[in-house]
């Protein structure tokens, strides 16, 4: 399967999670989705430089740590959504966490690893699902309030 198709399917899987969870409105809260799946999410201590998020595994229990040293809610939400991608996408857990341990994701660079690219595309589909965004952007008169609503979503 081509990488382009894998990325498209990852984005669609992010959107499908919203349907499965019956979440139909913006803003999407990745912290809530994690909680619904008994995934503990916490801010990461500032000890691992350049790490934006981590997926942790102990047996069948999972946790997510996200970078708190970057005080940007959108960045933090994307980091959590990215780690959820590793959790929800087929084959990711076995690839990034074949045994108990920690998988660290790094921000600020474009990874050549298709699993990281898929997790990014999953996060896009989860946080910016096409239908609600099209509906928001389809209004006849867009103004500052609409732009701010899209930003906050």
For the regions a protein language model found, what residue spans apply to each?
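Active-site hotspot residues in diverse enzymes, especially metal/ion-binding acidic/histidine motifs
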Residues: 1-153
């Amino acid at each position: 399967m081509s990488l382009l198709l894998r990325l498209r399917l990852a984005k669609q899987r992010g959107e499908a999670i919203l349907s499965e969870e019956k979440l139909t409105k913006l803003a999407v809260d990745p912290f809530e989705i994690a909680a619904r799946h008994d995934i503990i999410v916490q801010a990461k201590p500032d000890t691992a430089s350049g790490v934006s998020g981590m997926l942790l595994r102990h047996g069948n229990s999972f946790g997510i740590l996200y970078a708190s040293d970057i005080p940007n809610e959108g960045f933090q939400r994307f980091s959590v959504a990215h780690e959820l991608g590793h959790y929800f996408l087929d084959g990711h857990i076995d690839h990034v966490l074949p045994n108990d341990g920690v998988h660290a994701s790094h921000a600020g660079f474009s990874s050549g690893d298709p699993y990281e690219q898929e997790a990014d595309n999953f996060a896009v589909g989860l946080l910016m699902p096409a239908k609600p965004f099209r509906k928001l952007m389809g209004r006849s008169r867009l103004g500052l309030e609409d732009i701010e609503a899209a930003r906050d979503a």
